[in-house]
């Protein structure tokens, strides 16, 4: 998500691929919540992880992984796992970014979470 919310915000293929990867993660996590041994869902998550880490999603984007750097310190101090630490830090970052980036967050709501924009402002999305 840090790459997705990085600049530039205009449409580019990296953002489109990133949205597809995030939708796949959401879909397959939902499957695994009820069927933890589902091979297809696990393999799709592995593929999504590879896509997220191989650099293709960063092409054309300015990336900032300060949340990850902060989490490494938090994890070292508290011994929490990396994902749990990021789950605490990211919402704070996104609340900070939202006022100047409502269009990007609206796109995220629509294209990743499938939220219908009808009757909603960008900020409401």
Where are these regions (language model features)?
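Carboxylate- and glycine-rich phosphate/diphosphate-binding segment that chelates Mg2+/Mn2+
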Residues: 1-62
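Glycine-rich phosphate/pyrophosphate-binding beta-alpha loops
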Residues: 51-86
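Bulky hydrophobic/aromatic packing residues
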Residues: 47-50, 55, 65-67, 93-96, ...
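A general alpha-helix detector
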Residues: 24-28, 51, 69-73, 89, ...
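Gly/Pro-rich interdomain helix-loop hinge
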Residues: 74-125
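Catalytic-loop motifs flanking and including active-site residues across diverse enzymes
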Residues: 17, 21, 66, 85-89
């Amino acid at each position: 998500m840090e790459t997705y919310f990085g600049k530039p915000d205009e449409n580019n293929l990296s953002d489109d691929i990133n949205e597809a990867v995030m939708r796949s993660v959401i879909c397959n996590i939902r499957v695994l919540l009820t069927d933890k041994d589902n091979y297809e869902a696990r393999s799709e998550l592995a593929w999504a992880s590879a896509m997220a880490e191989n650099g293709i999603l960063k092409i054309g984007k300015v990336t900032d992984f300060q949340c990850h750097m902060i989490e490494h310190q938090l994890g070292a101090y508290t011994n929490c796992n990396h994902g749990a630490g990021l789950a605490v830090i990211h919402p704070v970052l996104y609340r900070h970014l939202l006022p100047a980036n409502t269009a990007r967050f609206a796109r995220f709501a629509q294209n990743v979470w499938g939220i219908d924009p009808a009757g909603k402002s960008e900020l409401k999305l």
